[in-house]
């Protein structure tokens, strides 16, 4: 019996040979996509104007929450590498670069990648860029996707398709503007104000304990049509 034959005889099943090439699988991403133009508009409508420092989202707190969520997903998949990816997509209006630069640099300083696109007309929004990036990461391997946006027209169908494939899909935003996500049977909704530390002070959202003298409408959490679905 040759030395090679003897080695094969005593090989342990399931244990790779010392000389064999070990191929590591690519890490799966927990992808966060922040739709800055959309959320800026939504926050402005809640505040009735531009946010002060107390009401601007804290991306360091959001990043810590994403890391915690990633760790939870990784704990259930010990055989797969899971990595977080935090991204912000924004438009840069002509002449606003100097104003926006400190914000962009602050985002990059806490680990967020920023996709910035010139805003030259109504067709130069970043919706298609966000969807393309989600599709790219899905092809490479997604552990979960989290989209911070109220734009159901752009995101509902692709996110529900991802969720149906078995990948958790979350929508982050303000419940006043996210009835489409709340009504979905496949998407999970997280209100940004429920994430610890994202806002330094409570947002002035209208509730029963904060009604104006003239009264106010309290919008439904989900559309009436959701009564026709299984999720009531």
Locations of regions flagged by a protein language model:
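Nuclease catalytic cores that cleave nucleic-acid phosphodiester bonds
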Residues: 95-231
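Actinobacteria-biased recognition of intrinsically disordered, low-complexity terminal regions
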Residues: 1-26, 208-232
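Domain-level signal for Mg2+-assisted phosphodiester chemistry and nucleotide/NA-binding surfaces
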Residues: 2-124
